[in-house]
């Protein structure tokens, strides 16, 4: 725990990379555990909503709105980080919030879009098969 505190206090030389941010983050902080739980719930809802289009569309739109608002959330968190965190993770570039908040939400939205494309291709294939079957039946009648 002491090494995390020392690492967080060291000045950065240039923009931090992914490995630097991951190494300097105290993953045992309650708010980060809560955020991880939120992402697990979002992923489960993504998986369970495949058969319910309206739920999936609402879930998709909520996640897109959250990603859109990430900059504002980052600014708010940067001003009030002492209320919920031991360290100031929220920089002006938004690298931390992009990694721990936006990236998992975007992965979920990509899963949903891939599912939509897959289903659309299946419907198009079924439609073309049906059209060919109807055409073949018409040709038989002639």
From Swiss-Prot:
Chain segments annotated as coiled-coil in the UniProt record: 120-142
Membrane-topology descriptor: Multi-pass membrane protein
GO CC annotation: nuclear membrane
Keywords of this entry: Coiled coil, DNA-binding, Membrane, Nucleus, Transmembrane, Transmembrane helix
Nuclear face residues: 51-56, 115-142
GO molecular function, one term: DNA binding
Transmembrane segments: 30-50, 57-77, 94-114
Keyword Acyltransferase: no
Matching InterPro entries: TMEM18
Domain of life: Eukaryota
Residue intervals on the Perinuclear space side: 1-29, 78-93
Region called DNA-binding, residue ranges: 115-142
Subcellular location field: Nucleus membrane
PANTHER family according to UniProt: TRANSMEMBRANE PROTEIN 18
Family: Belongs to the TMEM18 family.
Protein name: Transmembrane protein 18
Organism in which the protein naturally occurs: Gallus gallus (Chicken)
């Amino acid at each position: 725990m002491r090494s995390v505190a020392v690492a967080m206090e060291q000045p950065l030389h240039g923009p931090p990379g992914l490995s630097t941010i991951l190494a300097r983050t105290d993953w045992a902080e309650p708010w980060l555990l809560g955020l991880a739980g939120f992402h697990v719930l979002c992923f489960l809802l993504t998986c369970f909503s495949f058969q319910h289009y309206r739920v999936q569309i609402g879930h998709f739109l909520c996640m897109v709105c959250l990603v859109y608002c990430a900059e504002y959330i980052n600014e708010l968190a940067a001003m009030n980080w002492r209320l919920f965190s031991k360290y100031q993770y929220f920089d002006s570039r938004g690298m931390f919030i992009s990694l721990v908040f936006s990236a998992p939400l975007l992965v979920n939205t990509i899963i949903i879009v891939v599912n939509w494309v897959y289903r659309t291709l299946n419907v198009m294939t079924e439609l073309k098969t049906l059209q060919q079957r109807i055409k073949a039946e018409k040709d038989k009648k002639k």
